[in-house]
Amino acid sequence: IKECNTIFNTQNMILDVILSDKKSICDMNNIYFLVDINFLECNFIEMPDICSIFSNIIDNAIEACIKIKDTSIQKKIKLRGTVINRLFVIKCENTKINEVVLKNNKVITSKKDSFLHGIGISSVKSSVEKYNGNVEIYSDKNKFTITIYIPLTRN
């Protein structure tokens, strides 16, 4: 059994496991991974949606950070989740160097096999829409941000 140095306590066991797994990938790739999530009021979100939302946004952030070869640029992922005005707000920011093309709040992939790419964010949006939430995407030269808003109307 692999030793787990980092203990996450988001109040959701599945999310804690996902975060621990992603943290170990970040550690192997010298990516600073900061997490601050309180999931206490969000246990109405179903397990497949927790997996879809968090795995996809973190995987995308890791992929963008791995592309950074310039050692003067810190590879960094900041993931926060908190309740603001009866909304669970998830915000993931990561450093990047690759150009991100946005069209109608959708990421246009730069990958050659585009058929299979872009599915991650589509999965995130599909999961978020089940809870009447929405997703906002922002990209500038060196930072990508995805913000998710999920109303707390189910508890």
Name these PLM-found stretches.
Residues 11-29:
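Short beta-to-alpha transition helix within the HATPase_c
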Residues 71-86:
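Short beta-strand/loop element within the Bergerat-fold HATPase_c
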Residues 63, 67, 86-118:
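Glycine-rich/acidic phosphate-handling loop/turn and adjacent ATP-lid/helix
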Residues 120-124:
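Short alpha-helical Gxxx[C/S/T] motif in the catalytic ATP-binding
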Residues 7, 11, 33-54:
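Conserved short strand/loop->alpha-helix "switch" segment adjacent to the catalytic nucleotide/phosphoryl-transfer site
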